[in-house]
């Protein structure tokens, strides 16, 4: 008997994808949105199947992503934002809670929720990951969502 291998592909032709974006550090968030939309387009997706939801900050991303996922309108959700370390422990709390909350929302809803939230030590690292030296993590998160949509469809 041959082992069956199931994988998701990268076609986004009929994929309905919601982007949930933190407005805090918006100049980074907007670059991540541009990267995500570019990825969806390059993989055959269309703008009419993309919706963008904006929330105040990274702490709110999990609850908005969960609510969006529960609408049943989308095949996947992509969370985008930037949490940049400051001089207080606030970074650690927000980064941990956003990460945990997004994972929990995906598990509870059964809808793939991709993590495209930057957690960086400084603004330079965030800029690098939003479309310069280190690529665009919004693009990467959208690609993860597309692959997960196709994997779910193959199950």
UniProtKB/Swiss-Prot annotation:
It catalyses: (2S)-2-hydroxy-3-oxobutyl phosphate + 5-amino-6-(D-ribitylamino)uracil = 6,7-dimethyl-8-(1-D-ribityl)lumazine + phosphate + 2 H2O + H(+). The active site is at residue 90. This is 6,7-dimethyl-8-ribityllumazine synthase. NCBIfam families: lumazine-synth, PRK00061.1-4. It comes from the Bacteria. One of its GO terms (molecular function) is 6,7-dimethyl-8-ribityllumazine synthase activity. GO terms for cellular component: cytosol; riboflavin synthase complex. Catalyzes the formation of 6,7-dimethyl-8-ribityllumazine by condensation of 5-amino-6-(D-ribitylamino)uracil with 3,4-dihydroxy-2-butanone 4-phosphate. This is the penultimate step in the biosynthesis of riboflavin. HAMAP family: Lumazine_synth. Pathway: Cofactor biosynthesis; riboflavin biosynthesis; riboflavin from 2-hydroxy-3-oxobutyl phosphate and 5-amino-6-(D-ribitylamino)uracil: step 1/2. Keywords: Riboflavin biosynthesis, Transferase. GO terms for biological process: riboflavin biosynthetic process. 5-amino-6-(D-ribitylamino)uracil binds at residues 24, 58-60, 82-84, 115. Belongs to the DMRL synthase family. Pfam families: DMRL_synthase. InterPro entries: LS, LS/RS, LS/RS_sf. (2S)-2-hydroxy-3-oxobutyl phosphate binds at residues 87-88, 129. Its EC number is 2.5.1.78. It is an enzyme of class 2 (transferase). It comes from Chlorobium phaeovibrioides (strain DSM 265 / 1930).
């Amino acid at each position: 008997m041959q082992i069956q291998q199931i994988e998701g592909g990268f076609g986004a032709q009929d994929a309905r994808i919601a982007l949930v974006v933190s407005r805090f550090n918006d100049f980074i968030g907007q670059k991540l949105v541009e990267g995500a939309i570019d990825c969806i387009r390059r993989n055959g997706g269309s703008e009419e199947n993309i919706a963008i939801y904006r929330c105040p900050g990274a702490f709110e991303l999990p609850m908005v992503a969960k609510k969006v996922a529960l609408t049943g309108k989308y095949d996947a959700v992509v969370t985008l934002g930037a949490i940049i370390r400051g001089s207080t422990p606030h970074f650690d709390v927000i980064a941990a809670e956003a990460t945990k909350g997004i994972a929990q929302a995906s598990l509870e809803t059964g809808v793939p929720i991709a993590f495209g939230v930057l957690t960086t030590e400084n603004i330079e690292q965030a800029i690098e990951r939003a479309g310069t030296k280190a690529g665009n993590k919004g693009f990467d998160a959208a690609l993860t969502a597309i692959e997960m949509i196709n994997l779910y469809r193959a199950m």
